Amino acid sequence: MTASEERLAALTSWHADWSGLRVVVYGLGVTGFSVADTLAELGASVLVVASRADHERAMLLDVIGAELLLQADLSAPPERLTAFGPELIVVSPGFHADHPLLLWADQQGIPVWGDIELAWRLRDKTAPPGSGNSPADWICVTGTNGKTTTVQLTATMLLAGGSRVAPCGNIGVAVLDAIRDPQGFDVLVVELSSYQLHWINRNAGGEVSPYAAACLNIADDHLDWHGSLEAYAAAKAKVYENAQVACVYNRADEATLRMVEETEVVEGARAIGFGLDVPGPSDFGIVDGILCDRAFLDDRLHSAIELTTLEELREAGLAAPHIVANILAASALARAYGVEPWVVRDVLSAFRLDAHRIELVRIEAGVSWVDDSKATNPHAADASLRAYPSVVWVVGGLFKGVDLDGLVKRHAARLRGAVLIGADRDLLRSAFQRHAPGLPVVEVDADETEHVMPTAVRLAAALVRDGDTVLLAPAAASMDQFSDYAERGRLFQAAVNEYLGGGADDGSSASRPGSGG
């Protein structure tokens, strides 16, 4: 091990000597800025390399004492980068593993960390009061879909149970920002993308060891980044590595069980399954409409603890099957951390989903209009479609290299019609021609963002019948026509209310599926 490698391996604390370490940060999004800000605070010499940058963040770099190299073409290492002589590179999640600058780093023998490894090494920065300077525990959550809902639920349960908790990671708050919060936390609930997981546990001294971890599901997604489903799944599996207490997996997704079986964990860590069927010992599931914990009780062979009921979830608008699965996963993580069953039940009675997640916009003339713009891949759209018996499906966008045939074939029988939006309509059109040739399929060919949803709503209204649901579940990313999934959802809701007349408060009030509103 070289002197430089020895120094990096020893950097496992906020209180270590980071001063003068030459670090290059790739990217200046939320994650990249948090990395640069943290390293500058530690006294490292920081150069940020990016192809584009938000003006405010670029200005702030100068304030914190970090240098910015902004260059549109990063197909080769810029001269300033090579002259800087980095001892370490910290990469933002958006950089592909085969990016030319990362290939250059590998050729030069320069270690590469992700933001999660850096945060893990620095996790002792702020310990909660009375902890004896012990850093916060980490509960890590990944999966193709349901991560954010599960993280929010888990964090809310932990908070209600008396813990000081921060939901962070891919949910929007950088983990490095959470570990630097001066108040300190007992536990971080960390949402991890496959991009972030790709970079963890690669370097001595930076091995993440979560208190508990969950992979909710695995399906085709981000294959353009990872190259194959196998590589994508391998990245997701890293969430379980070195787990201390619980590995929560999906009984309906055998890939997640294989991950647990094949992963090295801390001795004594348990595998905890969740599913919508009857649970076995050490699992969470449903018996006669009752959500049960058969994992965290003394007599789990013969009894179970009631958490809530499907009827109560239906009243709260949380009864869609994929949401129930998220609830069971979150309950397993919270119970692993010691949250009492009554706390779980109280949280579920008050919890509400974020906007654009199976959000009922209007019910008019027997037709439900539902916004699930958050369904940004086929797996999420599949879960959404399963919640409704007869659907006019508004679908399309950027498909990120995934296969659509299975999704269309699986749901053809429940479709009244389809309205295609987005840049990759030809892929959708072909899938419908192969698997639903008799289905009415219409297309929105508007290029201007403001015209897409009004046209889609008008076309959907022409196809729909009494009792149907018009469902925006795009199964695709939004960046071809919208700034993000939230804008796509907002414009859909506005178009629905404009077409039907009045606002969301006229006629039937907006609520969640099954809320009785």
UniProtKB/Swiss-Prot annotation:
Gene Ontology MF terms: ATP binding; tetrahydrofolylpolyglutamate synthase activity; UDP-N-acetylmuramoylalanine-D-glutamate ligase activity
Taxonomic superkingdom: Bacteria
Enzyme Commission number(s) of this protein: 6.3.2.9
Pfam families: Mur_ligase_C (PF02875), Mur_ligase_M (PF08245), MurD-like_N (PF21799)
Gene Ontology CC terms: cytoplasm
GO biological process: cell division; cell wall organization; peptidoglycan biosynthetic process; regulation of cell shape
Keyword Acyltransferase found: no
Binding site for ATP: G143, T144, N145, G146, K147, T148, T149
Catalytic reaction(s) noted: UDP-N-acetyl-alpha-D-muramoyl-L-alanine + D-glutamate + ATP = UDP-N-acetyl-alpha-D-muramoyl-L-alanyl-D-glutamate + ADP + phosphate + H(+)
Record key words, sorted: ATP-binding, Cell cycle, Cell division, Cell shape, Cell wall biogenesis/degradation, Cytoplasm, Ligase, Nucleotide-binding, Peptidoglycan synthesis
Pathway(s) annotated for this protein in UniProt: Cell wall biogenesis; peptidoglycan biosynthesis
Main location class: cytoplasm
Cross-referenced InterPro entries: Folylpolyglutamate_synth_CS (IPR018109), Mur-like_cat_sf (IPR036565), Mur_ligase_C (IPR004101), Mur_ligase_C_dom_sf (IPR036615), Mur_ligase_cen (IPR013221), MurD (IPR005762)
Top EC class of this enzyme: ligase
Subcellular location: Cytoplasm
HAMAP family associated with the record: MurD
Function: Cell wall formation. Catalyzes the addition of glutamate to the nucleotide precursor UDP-N-acetylmuramoyl-L-alanine (UMA).
The family this protein is said to belong to: Belongs to the MurCDEF family.
Protein's recorded name: UDP-N-acetylmuramoylalanine--D-glutamate ligase
Species per Swiss-Prot/TrEMBL record: Leifsonia xyli subsp. xyli (strain CTCB07)
